């Protein structure tokens, strides 16, 4: 009988982001496939949903970028690796990656990294800091965009003996499914948000930050009214400001200046995202900087909603333009308004057809089981070498 593979995942915080949900999904997949699954994290809202009988969660301050804490964490992670006899350490962020690099060196364990973002670098020191994500035996890029970004910017940091590959992020298609939506809950949320009947609902999900382009989205809604005389919509900007109070105030002031405060609804959080998607007629991703993957676009398609997204980053891979959604020139509110107006003129059957094609697209390429199975297969290959 072969021994169970023991995998330790390390992530700063187990919240609702793409990296975090990927960690959560993989942790449970491993437990259900005869592995021992462990997660080190500092905390996060997703912890309460972890099946404690399947996945062991260990809390450490791995969110800290303080060099002293990074060294302390490396000592503690080393003890955890030895105590639980961990085979593979899979890390998803830079600060804890430095801790894990030291721990894996001391314990001679295999390290895996997932390169989740573009990790901006303005100087050589920052680039060296980022390069820790390339020090593992297996480097996973969540999209072709990230794969190309690594090759274009870090080719001098890549060790040819390490494996760099694309494993597309996946989502839970059973969770993101229209069939699970309760009419009662849908009506309740509709009333809670104060939405109106017979208005075209435009949903923009994502935390409030300038690179997500919420300000450009509001400008596009003003153009929709001014240039197209189109008032037939309500827009929901769904996301926490995460302490960015000044930016949120800017968005609210912009909404008032354009006399759109009766048409734009700012919602801080919705724990049931499939329910939120179900209220919409179209979903928008207005990012002005590249998304590493573009989870919103994939979730929207899974929920059979047309998606409009800026033509940069991962969205170009997840959306089939003019079939499952529409791409527009990023940072261009005028073009976004034009696309919005065109989508609003489509009949219900055409919108449903686009939604159905979106679901097919996600089922084929971005299923969470496929992501987890591919990762698990690579783990086994790594342990054989």
Label each residue range with its predicted role.
Residues 243-248, 261-270, 276, 326-327:
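Active-site donor-binding acidic/aromatic loop of nucleotide-activated sugar
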Residues 321-322, 326-334, 342-348:
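Conserved acidic donor-binding segment of nucleotide-sugar-dependent glycosyltransferases
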Residues 105, 111-144, 148, 158:
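A conserved, positively charged/aromatic
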Residues 20-25, 200, 204, 209-226, ...:
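A conserved mid-protein helix/loop that constitutes part of the nucleotide-sugar donor-binding site
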Residues 91-97, 115:
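Short His-centered aromatic/hydrophobic patch
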Residues 188-191, 335, 342, 349-365, ...:
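A short, well-ordered alpha-helix in the C-terminal region of glycosyltransferases
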Residues 136-166, 171-176:
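A short, active-site helix/loop in glycosyltransferases that binds the activated sugar's phosphate group
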Residues 306-309, 319:
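Short hydrophobic beta-strand element within catalytic cores of glycosyltransferases
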């Amino acid at each position: 009988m072969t021994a169970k593979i023991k995998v330790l995942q390390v992530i700063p915080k187990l919240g609702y982001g793409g990296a975090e949900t990927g960690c959560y999904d993989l942790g449970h997949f491993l437990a259900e496939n005869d592995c021992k699954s462990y997660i080190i994290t500092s905390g996060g809202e997703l912890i309460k949903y972890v099946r404690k009988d399947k996945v062991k969660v260990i809390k450490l301050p791995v969110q800290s970028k303080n060099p002293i804490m990074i060294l302390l964490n490396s000592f503690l992670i080393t003890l955890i690796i030895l105590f639980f006899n961990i085979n593979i350490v899979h890390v998803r962020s830079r600060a804890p990656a430095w801790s894990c690099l030291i721990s894996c060196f001391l314990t001679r364990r295999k390290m895996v990294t997932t390169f989740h973002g573009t990790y901006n670098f303005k100087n050589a020191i920052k680039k060296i800091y980022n390069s820790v994500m390339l020090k593992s035996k297996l480097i996973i890029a969540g999209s072709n965009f990230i794969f190309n970004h690594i090759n274009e910017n870090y080719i001098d940091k890549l060790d040819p003996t390490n494996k760099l590959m694309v494993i597309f992020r996946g989502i839970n298609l059973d969770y993101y499914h229209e069939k699970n939506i309760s009419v009662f809950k849908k009506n309740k949320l509709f009333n809670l948000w104060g939405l109106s009947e017979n208005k075209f609902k435009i949903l923009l999900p994502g935390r409030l930050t300038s690179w997500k382009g919420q300000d450009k989205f509001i400008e596009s809604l003003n153009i929709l009214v001014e240039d197209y005389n189109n008032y037939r919509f309500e827009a929901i900007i769904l996301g926490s400001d995460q302490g960015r109070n000044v930016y949120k105030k800017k968005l609210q002031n912009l909404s008032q200046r354009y006399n759109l405060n009766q048409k734009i609804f700012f919602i801080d959080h919705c724990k049931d995202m499939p329910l939120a998607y179900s209220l919409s007629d179209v979903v928008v991703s207005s990012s002005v900087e590249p998304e590493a993957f573009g989870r919103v676009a994939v979730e929207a398609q899974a929920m059979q909603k047309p998606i409009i997204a800026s033509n940069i980053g991962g969205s170009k891979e997840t959306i089939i333009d003019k079939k499952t959604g529409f791409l527009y020139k990023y940072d261009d509110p005028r073009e976004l308004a034009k696309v919005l107006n065109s989508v609003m003129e489509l009949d219900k059957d055409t919108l449903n057809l686009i939604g159905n094609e979106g679901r097919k697209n996600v089922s084929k390429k971005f299923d969470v089981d496929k992501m987890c199975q591919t990762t698990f297969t690579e783990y086994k290959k790594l342990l054989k070498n």
